Amino acid sequence: MKLRFQRVALVGKYQAPTSAGMSDSSRDALDGIARFLANEGCEVALEADTAANTGFTDYPALSVERIGLDCDLCLVVGGDGTMLGVGRQLAQYRTPLIGINQGRLGFITDIPLGEYPTVLKPMLRGEYEEDLRPLMRARVMRQGQCVFEALAMNDVVVNRGSTSGMVELRVEVGGHFVSNQRADGLIIASPTGSTAYALSAGGPMLHPTIPGWVLAPIAPHTLSNRPIVLSDSMEVAVEVVSGRDVSANFDMQSLASLQHGDRILVQRSDYRARFLHPRGWNYFATLRKKLRWNEGGY
């Protein structure tokens, strides 16, 4: 069967430190996958930082932008954090992504490392399930000016510093005042992020096809302050009323320090990440496996 993807880029989890910047297991995994892809007839490229940290010179090194412009597919080898970082950058190019899990839980990097040869072979020829995930656009406004802007796939989190007390946040949804919340922080999560930090804060899991967000307080002062499910068509505004060392995190990978009076505006982005899964994949099977439902015969 003819290849569906000719030019394939590899991105590795190079944050695992060794003297060379990447663990031996990660380097070996990338080497094996690159050789597999080449044997399948693909033109293989490496993301520039991945190439630098592996020391591999047999394949061209491309920036993420060039991957988006020139490659048919991006294979991410690592955990969900690696996929989030790459997925945000490639969403504007509509480049499909496949995740090979070298992390722990792996909700969106769902192919086990030891199974990639048998799983990838049919996927490279067009046998896959496509899964579109919306992104969030967040801006930090200070005295009417945007001082920071970022995309998020999982969540936008406004929270206190590690040594400070509660923060007070004024929350508006769709231009309507909701409440002033005193808590350790507030999470605005997408369906993808609803199984991450928001879940540990008591929020519900949203199916990926639901056009909604979860608004979940972190350790609220008032117990009646519960998570809310919102339409993602509405802008969420969070204003810092009081608190010390307050910050906004975007997928826990970029951070903005906040001042009193700052407003964080969160809107649905025009971009969506394109994840590809093996044929037969479904969301509920992922939940059942990752959250260990039905183990022990129940």
From Swiss-Prot:
GO molecular function terms noted in the UniProt entry: ATP binding; metal ion binding; NAD binding; NAD+ kinase activity
Domain of life: Bacteria
Cellular compartments per GO CC: cytoplasm
EC number: 2.7.1.23
Catalytic residues as annotated in Swiss-Prot or TrEMBL: 80
Entry's family note: Belongs to the NAD kinase family.
Keywords: ATP-binding, Cytoplasm, Kinase, NAD, NADP, Nucleotide-binding, Transferase
Purpose: Involved in the regulation of the intracellular balance of NAD and NADP, and is a key enzyme in the biosynthesis of NADP. Catalyzes specifically the phosphorylation on 2'-hydroxyl of the adenosine moiety of NAD to yield NADP.
GO biological process: NAD metabolic process; NADP biosynthetic process
Source species taxonomy: Bacteria, Pseudomonadati, Pseudomonadota, Betaproteobacteria, Burkholderiales
Name by which UniProt lists this protein: NAD kinase
InterPro entries, per database record: ATP-NAD_kinase_N (IPR017438), ATP-NAD_kinase_PpnK-typ_C (IPR017437), NAD/diacylglycerol_kinase_sf (IPR016064), NADK (IPR002504)
Main localization of the protein described in the UniProt heading: cytoplasm
Pfam families: NAD_kinase (PF01513), NAD_kinase_C (PF20143)
Entry's localization field: Cytoplasm
Necessary cofactors: a divalent metal cation
Gene this chain is encoded by: nadK
Enzyme class: transferase
Residues noted as binding NAD(+) in the record, renumbered to the chain: 80-81, 154-155, 182, 184, 195-200, 219, 253
Catalytic reactions on record: NAD(+) + ATP = ADP + NADP(+) + H(+)
Natural source organism: Paracidovorax citrulli (strain AAC00-1) (Acidovorax citrulli)
